[in-house]
């Protein structure tokens, strides 16, 4: 810290010397005048030293961690050039009969959102959006269509979206925000490029009709080469990363051995169980452990629950039916964040489509997250989140 200069004011009053008045002799007969008395000399006061008023020291600013990091995991990045390539998100169906999946375990972030198809009770299942950047899964499957909430979720990333299409009004909505997302590289629009493929073992026939919705696969690294857009990669961190493990907000949080997030009313719960050995949360679906096609169970470093109002409707011009909507643009709500067996809660806020989420803890301090893979659950704002120690 630079030294603070101090100034000393010295007040000195210099003495004033007055010459003595000499006697004036006046020759008068018979008398002589006595010499006039010299006036008293004024005393010169001694110099006075005045102490200066101390200049208040500015409050110290917290150090800024400027080390380069992978924007979607927060992991330190030795060579920033390695991050200069597009992030690729893929739309993956998540109903029981559409499992097992591939590639989910290699994503930096996975969003869990409403699927949109209603069951007999009027409830919707879920759809996943794994996002790849620090590493690219060779194959991701199955692949399905875009939903409206993908735009505000992925615009802060400048992402390419692997998909099989969308309703006409949703396509128009995607095109409107083309500055921040590339959603036109669908299965049909990239035929012959090797960006997508078909797993013949997943093709099925129902009532004489052949279906490929469970069989479509995406190759993210190949898909990224089909455009020159977003070659510099995400230009901002998606989450507020802590500079060290000691800075992570959950260090002083409450215990969270298990987490349950409902989607269909108070049922259809996605759940997480903390594993002390790996220091990660193992994920389960409503019917059992979330396991990939290769037998690997999903386990993540961070679980982030963002509660937001869910409903169905149309928010842009064009044909097509109502789609599931999550109100996160220019909104706020409650969040829960868990890491290493502990959790904190607070308020999330999000501005416009391309603005990242902001998170504030209940005590008013900003959230600091641990680096690593993150699952983001997006239940309704009225959902009852169960966290047990």
Q: What name fits each language-model region?
A:
Residues 1-4, 15-22:
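Secretory targeting signals
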Residues 5, 33-35, 219:
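Flexible coil/loop interruptions and hinge/linker segments embedded within long fibrous stalks
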Residues 6-10:
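N-terminal export leaders
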Residues 11-14, 25:
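Intrinsically disordered, low-complexity acidic regions enriched in Pro/Ser/Thr
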Residues 19, 33-34, 180:
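A general structural signal for well-ordered secondary-structure junctions
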Residues 26-73, 80:
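N-terminal low-complexity, Pro/Thr-rich disordered segments
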Residues 65-111, 118-389:
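A surface/extracellular/periplasmic glyco- and lipid-processing/surface-interacting theme
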């Amino acid at each position: 810290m630079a030294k603070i200069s101090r100034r000393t004011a010295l007040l000195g009053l210099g003495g004033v010397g007055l010459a003595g008045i000499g006697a004036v002799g006046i020759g008068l007969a018979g008398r002589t005048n006595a010499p006039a008395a010299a006036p008293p000399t004024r005393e010169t006061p001694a110099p006075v030293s005045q102490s200066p008023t101390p200049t208040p020291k500015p409050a110290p600013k917290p150090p800024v961690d400027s080390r380069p990091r992978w924007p979607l995991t927060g992991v330190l990045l030795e060579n920033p050039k390695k991050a200069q390539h597009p992030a690729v998100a893929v739309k993956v169906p998540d109903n029981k009969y559409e499992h097992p999946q591939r590639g989910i375990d290699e994503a930096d972030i996975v969003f869990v959102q409403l699927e949109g198809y209603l069951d007999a009770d009027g409830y919707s299942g879920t759809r996943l959006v794994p996002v790849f950047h620090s590493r690219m899964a060779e194959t991701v499957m199955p692949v399905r269509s875009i939903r409206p909430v993908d735009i505000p979720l992925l615009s802060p990333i400048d992402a390419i979206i692997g998909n099989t299409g969308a309703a006409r009004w949703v396509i128009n909505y995607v095109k409107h925000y083309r500055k921040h997302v590339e959603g036109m590289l669908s299965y049909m629009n990239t035929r012959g490029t090797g960006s997508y493929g078909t797993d013949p073992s997943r093709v099925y026939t129902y009532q004489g009709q052949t279906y490929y919705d469970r069989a479509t696969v995406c190759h993210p690294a190949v898909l990224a080469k089909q455009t020159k857009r977003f070659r510099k990669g995400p230009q901002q961190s998606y989450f507020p990363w802590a500079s060290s493990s000691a800075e992570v907000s959950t260090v002083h949080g409450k215990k969270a051995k298990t987490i349950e997030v409902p989607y269909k009313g108070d049922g259809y719960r996605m759940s997480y169980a903390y594993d002390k050995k790996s220091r990660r949360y193992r994920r389960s679906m409503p019917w059992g452990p979330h396991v990939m096609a290769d037998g690997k169970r999903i386990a993540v470093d961070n679980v982030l629950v963002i509660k937001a109002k869910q409903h169905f409707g149309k928010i842009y011009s064009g044909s097509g039916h109502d789609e599931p909507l999550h109100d996160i643009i220019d909104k706020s709500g409650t969040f829960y964040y868990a890491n290493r067996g502990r959790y904190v809660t607070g308020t999330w806020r999000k501005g416009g489509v391309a603005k990242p989420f902001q998170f504030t803890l209940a005590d008013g301090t900003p959230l600091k997250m641990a680096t690593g893979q993150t699952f983001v659950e997006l239940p309704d704002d009225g959902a009852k989140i169960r966290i047990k120690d």
